Amino acid sequence: METGCWVLGGEFEDSVFEQKPERQPEPPSSYGAKLCEPQWFYEETESSNDIEVLTLKKFRGDLAYRRQEYEKALQEYSSISKQLPSTNFAMKRDVQEGQARCLAHLGRHEEALEIAVDLESKATNTEHLTSALSLHLAIFSRRQSLEKTILYLQKLISLHPLNPWSWCKLAEAYLSPGPDLPALGESPQGQKSSASSDKAVRASSVHSGTGCLPFPAPSPDSAVFSVEASGCDTQQDMQNCLAARRAAAQTEAQRKACAALIRARLLLQLAQSQQTSFALEKNLRTQQEIAQKVKEFSFREDTLLLMEEAMGEDIVPERIKEELHPEVQCVGPAALTASVAASSKEFEDKWFRKVRDHFSPLEKQSHVDIQIMA
């Protein structure tokens, strides 16, 4: 062959052109699916795997909790807790949360709170902390502690500021008449003051410690506003003072509730483009309910526009996507603690300052009017 000549196909091996025998497919191996009958976990098991046995017990506890058999569920969870190896952190957290929720339903709130505090202190990521804060919220809600309920809603919102449902719950809490304080006319010694005959004046209309009052809250030692020190000598003067303060407290609560609802609506509006079916239906229905509630507050249009601007400054579509598909962030305890509001004042200064500043001249005038009336 002359140098430089090229033969077509000469660069391939002969094996390339050989026809390989066809492989006959083997018959599929038999597969026996595990059939789980209803309440299959109540059957006796011969498994030697301790974790599998404990998992079955947890299922029994979960079913008992679902049936509201809290004593039975607590027994199951407690028996698991004693046998769990110290290295099985995931199941231990689940079991502890189950114990705490059962204790809360049984009225043993202090024991439930001890577990919740322990879970919060051991949280190593945002998912753990969210579960612990939600547990605190459930306990204080059952305990009917409005101040703490609002605080832990604020903590959850600090961790997940783009969750519209938490903002809706916060608005509802601001408008709830909480039983945190006894009757306003009751003295520290348990005796009724001269204003005790005014049964319409109840502490349930005052949200102590939650920032709902534009005036100093009463001290824990006394459920009576210091109206005597303000010059409210007569019973009529005292009733006028209390009525004015009650009205101011209700107005302040309505402002914050309205701002929270407006933010929830903004978040729902951005999320609706990514939702379908029942999720979208719930979204649109909630927006309608919010619109009706905001209308009932009867705030001026410029006030509502200011609230919408203030509560929507950080809302962008990219952040909404992150909230709908969150990533579990593993951070240190110090970083987790810094990510949530330490107090209601800190939270409300961050979120409601612009709204409060808008109304501050009116509040000052209202305060002066009360002092003159006193």
Swiss-Prot record:
Polar residues compositional bias: what residue ranges? 188-197
What are the boundaries of the region Disordered? 182-201
Residues folding into a coiled coil are: none
Q: Which SUPFAM superfamilies match?
A: TPR-like (SSF48452)
List, alphabetically, the PANTHER family matched. Answer: ZINC FINGERS AND HOMEOBOXES PROTEIN 1, ISOFORM 2 (PTHR31919:SF1)
Record protein name field: Uncharacterized protein C8orf76 homolog
Supply the source organism for this entry: Rattus norvegicus (Rat)
